[in-house]
A protein has these predicted regions:
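Short, intrinsically disordered, charge-balanced linker/junction segments flanking boundaries
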Residues: 126-135
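GST-like domain detector, emphasizing the conserved glutathione-binding G-site
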Residues: 1-113, 122, 128
Length: 135
C-alpha cells in the first residue's frame, strides 16, 4: 500500500525470537496494549495487527477504501474472509495433524477459493472494486 501510494517509509524486518521479543517488551513498557507484527509507527503512535494497520493507512492516505458503506463493508468482508482462510491454513499446516490438513485441502481451501472468486467477480476487473485498486 505504501509503495503504491509512493510514501517514503523505513521497512524493518525483525527475527521472531530475540529481536521481536525485545521490541515487544519495549512496546509493552511504552503502554502498547497488544503489540503484534506487523505494526506501523506514524507520528510517534504505534498501530498493530494486519487489518487495523491496513485500515489506518487507507484512512490516512484517503485511498484503498470504499466510497460508501456498502463498499467499505465489502472490503471488511473480503479481509475477514482472507483472515479466516489464513487461520485455517495455519492450523492445518502447522498443527501437525494429517486429518486436519486433509480437511483443509479438501474443504476449507476449496470453499475459500470459491468465496474469494465470488467476491472478486462482483465488479469487472482483477481487484475488489474492478479495474482500479481503489476508488
Amino acid at each position: 500500500m505504501l509503495e503504491d501510494a509512493s510514501v517514503d517509509y523505513e521497512y524493518v524486518r525483525l527475527t521472531w525470537d530475540h529481536q521481536w521479543q525485545a521490541k515487544k517488551h519495549e512496546l509493552l513498557e511504552q503502554g502498547a496494549i497488544d503489540p503484534t507484527m506487523p505494526y506501523i509507527t506514524i507520528g510517534g503512535k504505534h498501530y498493530f495487527k494486519t487489518l487495523p494497520v491496513m485500515r489506518i493507512i487507507a484512512k490516512k492516505l484517503g485511498k484503498y477504501n470504499g466510497e460508501n458503506e456498502e463498499e467499505e463493508h465489502l472490503l471488511d468482508a473480503y479481509s475477514d474472509s482472507i483472515n479466516d482462510w489464513i487461520t485455517k491454513w495455519a492450523t492445518a499446516v502447522f498443527g501437525g495433524n494429517e486429518e486436519v490438513l486433509k480437511t483443509y485441502k479438501e474443504t476449507h481451501r476449496v470453499n475459500a477459493h470459491k468465496l474469494l472468486n465470488r467476491m472478486l467477480s462482483l465488479n469487472k476487473g482483477p481487484y475488489v472494486f474492478g479495474e482500479k485498486v481503489n476508488r
